[in-house]
Amino acid sequence: IIEDGSPDGTSEIVKTMQTEFPTQLFMIERKGKLGLGTAYITGFKWALAHNYEYIFEMDADFSHNPKDLPRLYDACANMGADVAIGSRYVTGVNVVNWPIGRVLMSYFASKYVRFVLGMNIADTTAGFKCYRREVLETIELDQIRFKGYAFQVEMKFTAYKCGFVLKEVPIIFINRELGTSKMSGGIFGEAFFGVIQLKMNSWVRKFPKKKI
């Protein structure tokens, strides 16, 4: 768990649970809100340093069902994927309890990203994924520049340009029952214009390649 000074008592709860799960539950505490992307990068680096072969990312509010974790793992371990994506849109629209406006914005945002970047991925903004460690070792994590929701797009696009296999696994996304989304106009703007920046940068950037 990457904890950025949340005011809801998360760190205290985790510390209590760590006494029960000392070899399974870990937490990195950071000062202030440093952004979604930097939190994931911090977690990825920790996982690589501790020699994990498969690294997952997911929301902590149960919008992503932990029961789907073995399916993402199986896609990477046994079905040839380098990155397994828990996809809301690969078999239609599998989202529960979102307002129709939010569903449409997310769905067409993924369509937009797919069109601009040329990735054959239905859910380009998904945040439920499993990576083989080789992916995170190859894509130069310190070169990932976006901190908001565009981070999710940048990670997929970079892995794609490096030659890794991305596979979508259908899931049902259930909106959180408590709390509120952190989506804002600024985050949406970063994602919209960030996609164009990613495409333009890809014309001149030399991406590291997957080892065969």
Where are these regions (language model features)?
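Short beta-strand/loop segment that forms part of the nucleotide-sugar
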Residues: 1-6, 28-29, 58
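Hydrophobic helical membrane-anchoring modules
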Residues: 118, 142-212
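Acceptor/aglycone-binding surface of glycosyltransferases and processive sugar-polymer synthases
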Residues: 28-49, 54, 66-149, 176-193
